[in-house]
């Protein structure tokens, strides 16, 4: 928890000192830099909201039963929260921001630390990170929707199946 807190606070400090130049130089890297900072600030607020709401139940007008200490109620608590449209939308934005921030952070790490040096290597690493972000967004969104709708984003026909039960016959007696 402490490394995440350090990363978050340090990221907010860096973001407050950063000068955005997307108006002057609208290159993809400048936009990516902007979105990395924007998602970081959003995630700082979102994670604070998430912890207050889900762990402690301290957000007025929402869940008042904390999940901490109530593991047997956790599914019902989350399902009730995600049934509220704006909460679901907020969490989907949270999943999108997390997926982008993590995937682009991997790419920045690989470039800054000299793991991918050449222009082509950086381009393909970026493609891989974008694919990772899309995959994480899909999995995370499906998980969130699954609390409200069985099967999540998948059609019911894909996840509902009939289980054949075999009738156990009694053993033959001699």
Task: Give each language-model segment a name.
Residues 1-174:
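Membrane-embedded alpha-helical bundles that constitute the cytochrome b-like, heme-associated redox core
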């Amino acid at each position: 928890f402490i490394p995440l807190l350090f990363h978050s606070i340090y990221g907010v400090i860096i973001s407050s000192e950063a000068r955005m130049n997307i108006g002057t130089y609208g290159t993809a890297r400048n936009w990516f830099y902007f979105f990395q900072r924007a998602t970081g600030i959003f995630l700082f607020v979102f994670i604070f909201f998430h912890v207050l709401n889900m762990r402690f139940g301290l957000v007025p007008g929402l869940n008042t039963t904390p999940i901490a200490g109530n593991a047997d109620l956790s599914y019902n608590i989350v399902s009730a929260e995600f049934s509220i449209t704006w909460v679901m939308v907020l969490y989907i934005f949270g999943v999108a921001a997390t997926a982008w921030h993590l995937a682009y952070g991997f790419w920045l790490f690989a470039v800054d630390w000299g793991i991918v040096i050449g222009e082509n290597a950086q381009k393909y690493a970026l493609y891989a990170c974008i694919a990772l972000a899309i995959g994480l967004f899909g999995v995370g969104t499906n998980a969130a929707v699954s609390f409200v709708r069985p099967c999540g984003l998948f059609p019911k026909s894909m996840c509902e199946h009939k289980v054949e039960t075999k009738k156990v016959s009694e053993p033959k007696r001699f």
